[in-house]
Amino acid sequence: MDRISNLPNEIICHIVSFLSAKEAAFASVLSKRWQNLFTIVQKLEFDDSVKNQGSLMDFVNGVLALPVTTRISKFSLRFDSFLKRKLETGLVIGPHVVNRCLCNVLKRGVLDLKLEIYGEDGYLLPSEVFTCKTIVDLKLTSCIFAESYVIDVIPENAFLPGLESLFLKSIWFSDLRGCAFQTLLSACPVLKTLTIYDVQWEKWKWSRTVSSATLERLIIQRTEFTYFNGSDFKSITFDTPSLTYLKYIDFVPEEYPVVNLDSIVEAKLHLILTGNQDYPVRYLGREDDPITSNPTNLIKGLRNVEILHLSTATAQMLCFFPRETLPEFVNLHHLTIGPTYYECFNWRLLPILLKKTPNLKTLMIKGPLHLYYRDFNDDEEEEEPEYYCECSSGCNCLLSCHMEVLEISHYRGTTKELEKLKHFLGKLSCLEHVKLGVWASSDKEKLSITTDLLMLPRASVNCKIQINFS
């Protein structure tokens, strides 16, 4: 008997996990003992972007050659383009070859299925993917600039009873007879996490509804903001009563008819208004650029949130709607605004937010307290318009605020920033900890900034200032 056969079963199974499908198939016929150990293959993966990976056909044949009793826990396939493969190798490897392999894998109790199909030549998933009873984690990835992954039909018997996590990247849904997207969600009775990356709603044909009674985490992230055509971007409904986490990066549609986010705990928002629904608003309020987006219902639907992250664009957006738009966030204890590297935070919003957050404990500003920008045609730094960076001297709500932690990530020690910080420290009587990320070019500047900060009067005797120089 060889040395490997003397190893414990656990170690042999670990070795097996590093074999290709073809090697696993060959190894399974070495002996009855090895064949029994091959009843479960932990992971099979093919990535044609990796050199010396071997051919896709060999991989497929290896999968098909596995004993019928072999189970596969995790299956991953990354394939660039059927057309490209034909041009490079002369082999005709069509979608039917990949789908034959997939259908075989789906019969082997697969738990984790990851498919990355890139290219411009189109690809349709086999319907068996949507009736697999064992999948727990499903990831489907395509290319944002091509219709290479379109789901236009979900079978009537679609049912994924074990699916807990669904990841969709650059996937389009197009069903002229109904809504393939909602049909898919309805087929997932225990779905907990949904990620929609590289989303382009305006290219979908769907009911404009995200509905799931079990969903707990939802990530919607648009990555392409340049070629936006919002002519058919009218509304989005969120009916997710169990949702606790929301990350939402996108343009704002004309309306949110229904928003059910009663269980929300944490939300991260980067939302951009549009004018005439065809391009981002850059000069809000102009008569020739009317605002057609309306986030009112969405913001009101977040009233139970405990941790809220607002991008600068989102915070600025809220300034263009009546104060009544903001509900009272009675559960909110942590508020983050920013980053503010390229956009300025409209400070007029802060008093409004503080009045609406009676139980706020932590305020984090990812950026400076006062913004300067550089005109690329000039070497001088200039201040932003005063209405953006007006000081908080009139912010009487600070006197009744129970904030305990204030964090500023890009403090520079300028006169305007020092003045603004003075108002915070002089009025926040419950403040315990101030964290400042400070940029300084010399030891002399560090000493000057530190001295100025330590000299500031504080309403709270327990307030400590932590300075982190970079």
From Swiss-Prot:
Name the UniProt key words of this record, in alphabetical order: Leucine-rich repeat, Repeat
Q: Where is the F-box domain?
A: 1-53
Q: Among its keywords, does the record have Ubl conjugation?
A: no
Task: Output the superkingdom of the source species.
Answer: Eukaryota
Residue ranges of the LRR repeats are 114-142, 143-170, 173-198, 225-250, 287-312, 342-367
InterPro entries hit by this protein: F-box-like_dom_sf, F-box_AtFBL13-like, F-box_dom, FBD, FBL60-like, LRR_dom_sf, LRR_FXL15/At3g58940/PEG3-like
Q: Which CDD domains match?
A: F-box_AtFBL13-like
Quick check: keyword Repeat in the entry? yes
Q: Which PANTHER family match?
A: RNI-LIKE SUPERFAMILY PROTEIN (PTHR31293:SF12)
Protein name as it appears in the record? Putative F-box/LRR-repeat protein At3g58920
Q: Which organism is it from?
A: Arabidopsis thaliana (Mouse-ear cress)
What lineage does the source organism belong to? Eukaryota, Viridiplantae, Streptophyta, Embryophyta, Tracheophyta
